[in-house]
């Protein structure tokens, strides 16, 4: 009997023992920085001359690791292995597959601070953000294992007296998992384990800036007893390996988390039926957002300011759920803006390996350059009241930036920035605020700070986002509690960590027997 699902608690670093344990995790990771990691195809570890070099975004001179890079030839080998392995893996018992997830979760739980320390070094996450990432990875495995046990016998359907009808789920086939750099453990592990526990085999292509944590996760899966060939580790260039696998006629589905433009490109390529292909590929995509916190005039204004700052600048704003727009009723606009500026100026931007750092670096030079270009746009479209500066001399650090008095149709209110920049916009009334919030091609997360019950219910109906929060920030969805995924250009309407997510990795089969 499996105990009921409960999310992994976050670590309290005010407890000295927890602080010391995390520091030990950092020391352990530092002891193997710079190591080489192989591809893994059918259990075979393959080393290539061409490497993906992972560096610490807080210290560009520090090498986190070097991961062998797959070529198209190796990607083809991995596809053949995954396709062949699927013929046996699809017949494996769901209970066995779920047990592998539970064992993997237990292994990660024992090594929790080590994995979080990898995220500090490779993704530039402060302690609390890294800890939450690792906890979410554990949650995905615990939750999806239990969900598979619920779905293993199918869903009851009606039968007449002369027949026996069954509605069951069977796996799809080979899945290509293209995971992001911003949650390089949680989302990567969630996408991968959802696919494998559903009976599919996997080609895992992690983000090129954060491949080491994925390589370490492959060790966990092996230790947990996952058979060789079920998950094949093929880091590589998106334009070479990614496109090749998306186009491949034996690819049955693609699970992607990343930018809007790449997601659209994958969706377009997957729609084409290539020679030898006998199915329409399924795409499961989460593609970002332009997320808004709406502040009503009847609201806890201190809560509003704190929610905006936490949601805008957590992990340097590099969350698809991050608050990129604060739309505030004109009667309370100045108060909330001024308080948010005060709170923002209290944030520390520094080495994320140091406990107490609020913000670390952004992901890489490309991210730094993009965010700073939007800071420049902000100087033209509004008033910069906090931040506005960056320093890429040692790492890619950007100060948390508030841009005030931004027009509702400005670029800062329309385009995804993916960095520590939030635009403040004034609304005439609550209806106007909702209209501004909905005036975007995205629809991922949003929040409303209000004490007006009628306004809360109106937003519940009319605020068109997949994850809507009231009287809290717009980030921090918990697996199994707040299934995550959005509308419009935020993706394909999938809900990671939700009760229908595994079904996206399977197909329904009806059998009817005459008695």
UniProtKB/Swiss-Prot annotation:
State one molecular function term (GO): 1-pyrroline-5-carboxylate dehydrogenase activity
This protein's GO cellular component annotations are: cytoplasmic side of plasma membrane
InterPro entries in the cross-refs:
Ald_DH/histidinol_DH (IPR016161), Ald_DH_C (IPR016163), Ald_DH_CS_CYS (IPR016160), Ald_DH_CS_GLU (IPR029510), Ald_DH_N (IPR016162), Aldehyde_DH_dom (IPR015590), Proline_metab_enzyme (IPR050485), RocA (IPR005932)
Gene Ontology terms: biological process: glutamate biosynthetic process; proline catabolic process to glutamate
Keyword list (alphabetical) reads: NAD, Oxidoreductase
Enzyme class, first EC level, given as a word: oxidoreductase
Q: Which residues cross the membrane?
A: none
The reply on keyword Cytoplasm is: no
Reactions the enzyme catalyzes: L-glutamate 5-semialdehyde + NAD(+) + H2O = L-glutamate + NADH + 2 H(+)
Enzyme Commission numbers on file? 1.2.1.88
By sequence similarity, the record places it as follows:
Belongs to the aldehyde dehydrogenase family. RocA subfamily.
- What NCBIfam families does this protein's entry cite? D1pyr5carbox2, PRK03137.1
Q: What is this protein called?
A: 1-pyrroline-5-carboxylate dehydrogenase
């Amino acid at each position: 009997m499996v105990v009921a699902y409960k999310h992994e608690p976050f670590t309290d670093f005010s407890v000295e023992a927890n602080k010391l344990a995390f520091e030990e995790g950092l020391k352990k990771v530092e002891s193997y920085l710079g190591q080489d990691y192989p591809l893994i195809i059918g259990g075979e570890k393959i080393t290539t001359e061409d490497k993906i070099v992972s560096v610490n975004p807080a210290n560009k001179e520090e090498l986190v690791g070097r991961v062998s890079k797959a070529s198209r030839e190796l990607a083809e080998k991995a596809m053949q292995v995954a396709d062949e392995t699927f013929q046996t893996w699809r017949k494996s018992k769901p209970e066995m597959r779920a047990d592998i997830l539970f064992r993997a979760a237990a292994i990660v739980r024992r090594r929790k601070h080590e994995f979080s320390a990898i995220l500090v070094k490779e993704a530039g996450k402060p302690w609390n953000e890294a800890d939450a990432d690792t906890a979410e990875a554990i949650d995905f495995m615990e939750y999806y294992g239990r969900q598979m046990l619920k779905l293993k016998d199918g869903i009851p359907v009606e039968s007449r007296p002369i027949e026996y009808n069954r509605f069951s789920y069977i796996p799809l086939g080979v899945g290509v998992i293209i995971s992001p750099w911003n949650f390089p453990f949680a989302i990567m592990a969630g996408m991968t384990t959802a696919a494998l526990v559903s009976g599919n085999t996997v080609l895992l292509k992690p983000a090129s800036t954060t491949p080491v944590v994925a390589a370490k996760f492959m060790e966990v899966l092996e230790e947990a007893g996952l058979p060789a060939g079920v998950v094949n580790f093929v880091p590589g260039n998106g334009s070479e390996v990614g496109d090749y696998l998306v186009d491949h006629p034996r690819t049955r589905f693609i699970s992607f988390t990343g930018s809007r433009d790449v997601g659209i490109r994958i969706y377009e390529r997957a729609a084409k039926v290539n020679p030898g292909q006998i199915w329409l590929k399924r795409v499961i995509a989460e593609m970002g957002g332009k997320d808004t916190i709406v502040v009503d005039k009847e609201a806890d204004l201190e809560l509003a300011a704190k929610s905006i700052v936490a949601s805008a600048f957590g992990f340097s704003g590099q969350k698809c759920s991050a608050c990129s727009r604060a739309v505030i009723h004109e009667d309370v606009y100045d108060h909330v803006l001024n308080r948010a500026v005060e709170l923002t100026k209290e944030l520390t931007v520094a080495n994320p390996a140091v406990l107490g750092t609020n913000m670390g670096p952004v992901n890489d030079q490309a991210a730094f350059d993009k965010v700073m270009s939007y800071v420049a746009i902000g100087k033209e479209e509004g008033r910069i009241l906090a931040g506005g500066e960056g320093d890429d001399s040692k790492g890619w650090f950007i100060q948390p930036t508030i841009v005030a008095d931004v027009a509702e149709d400005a670029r800062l209110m329309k385009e995804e920035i993916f960095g520590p920049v939030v635009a403040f916009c004034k609304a005439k009334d609550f209806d106007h605020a909702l209209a501004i919030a909905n005036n975007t091609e995205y629809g991922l997360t949003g929040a409303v700070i209000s004490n007006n019950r009628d306004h809360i219910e109106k937003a519940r109906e009319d605020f068109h986002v997949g994850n809507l929060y009231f009287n809290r920030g717009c980030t921090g969805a918990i697996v199994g509690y707040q299934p995550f995924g959005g509308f419009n250009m935020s993706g394909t309407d999938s809900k990671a960590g939700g009760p229908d997510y595994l079904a996206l990795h399977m197909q329904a089969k009806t059998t009817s027997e005459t008695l």
